[in-house]
Amino acid sequence: TASTVQSRGVYHFPYKQSVLADEDEQCSALGNSTTSWGAKSSEMCILTERDREFSMGQFLWTGFDYIGEPTPYHTRNSYFGQIDTAGFEKDSFFLYRGAWTDAKKAPFVHVFPYWNFNPGQLVDVRVASNGAFVELLLNGRSIGEYQIDHEKGTVLTGNWQVAYEPGELTAIAYDENHQEIARESRHSYGEPVKLVMELYQPEKEFTAGNYDLAYVTISAVDAQGYPVEDANQYVEVSVKGAGWLTGLDNGDSTDTDEYKGYCRRMFNGKLLAIVAIGEHKGSIQVKAAAGGLQPAELTIVVSKEISIEGTSFIPEVFANKSGKDAPAWVR
């Protein structure tokens, strides 16, 4: 088990100080909120498993947040997940990704927190990666480099304390030969001016009558197009055409708005709309609107249709005692 607690996009400084009892009823995604019975950090969970002589893998409590057991506060749902109830990754997700994935096959780097604070404020910055080295840059200047020893090391992220200045914070991951394998940037942002919608798995082919769901992420950007990572405006969502809206979620443990509504606020810059695919092919128009922001619109194409009458089966797996193919009249 782990029972580490964190809220997506919430950061309580400084990192070296354990912070739990907060008026916002949120847990710090930096990794400095802990419970009395749980692991002291995600790193400790990883190291305990890594350093055993044999391991079949790692079972973690929990992968996803879930409704109920709202420890350590009296809110709506748990804080234990590495992914929130809306399916958005928390920063701790990337620590486990760094430990369990191969940089030669799927290199990545992740820097947190977001980059928008008060000038001169000291900000704890962490970088997770499956690479051998990570480097942090602020507006093109190197802040420093850190070696991550995934096999024997006890510190599995690069860690810096940086005086905030507006601009771009960039993390670069390198392999053992110091060749760049991945990079990620976070940018300072202004006030939100418009909404943006993104379809999860846009290459997916949706089929009518197949009880399928489409997941649409709604976010906000500023006038320069940079994500506003703490946006919290209420968003009204409408769906027309060959599907319907089934619910909205933002992953906020303190939010008690209904999942089945058509209006809900973003939590730290994100809102998820879940759209059900109907019984007939065609197109689905999803619209999102918020006061004072330019609205967004997305079209989902439902290109195929299956029969929903009678009993269906997959011919390739049909079998009978004689071993013969199914008769033509069997559907």
What function would you assign to each model-found segment?
Residues 158-164, 259-279:
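Short, hydrophobic beta-strand segments
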Residues 190-222, 228-229:
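Beta-strand-rich domain onsets/edges
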Residues 125-129, 172-173, 211-228, 235, ...:
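Beta-strand-rich structural segments
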Residues 1-150, 157-180:
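Extended substrate-binding grooves/exosites of carbohydrate-active enzymes
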Residues 130, 136-143, 183-185, 213, ...:
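Short flexible loop/turn segments that cap and initiate beta-strands
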